Amino acid sequence: IGPAAQIGIALWLLLLLGVKGLAPILLENNSKDSRAFADDIKPMLPGHPNQVIFVEDMSRNGLNLYLQTNIKKVSFEPRPKPISDSAFDSSLAQELAQPADQRLFIMKREMEQAFLAGVQASGRTPRKLGEWIEKEKPSDRDRMIYTLDNEFATR
């Protein structure tokens, strides 16, 4: 490899390292930054969740890295699950029929009333842990965070 190629490779490596170093700064206020989301909600949690369940919402699968937990998505209505896969793992009613497992339920503000109705219909008691308000963003991006009675019972 000639001197020009060596300089080109060195510049390319510097560019790659620079982009890698700048990415966290550029993503700092990004709503899809799972690390920031996890850091924001950790103080609300009554313990370590075994499952984070997104109700009629986009899941943030990166939370499994920062909370060391399983991520699920549920819908209000049962939806057929094709062989290949489905956008939702189950319905809210199916999830609520499962035994307590230190679950968190996260949803957009506009889904909160439907979630509460579904939980109450199942005979369970919802417990609001808090709200995640995304900084400097419209309120339609706020997320409500719930658990259920006896989900985080002391062992």
Predicted regions and their residues:
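Short periplasmic/luminal acceptor-recognition loop of GT-C membrane glycosyltransferases, typified by
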Residues: W12-G118, T125-K128, W132-S139, M144-N150
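Membrane-interfacial entry segments at the cytosolic side of transmembrane helices
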Residues: I1-L11
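Short, charged/polar, Gly/Pro-enriched secondary-structure boundary elements
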Residues: F152-R155
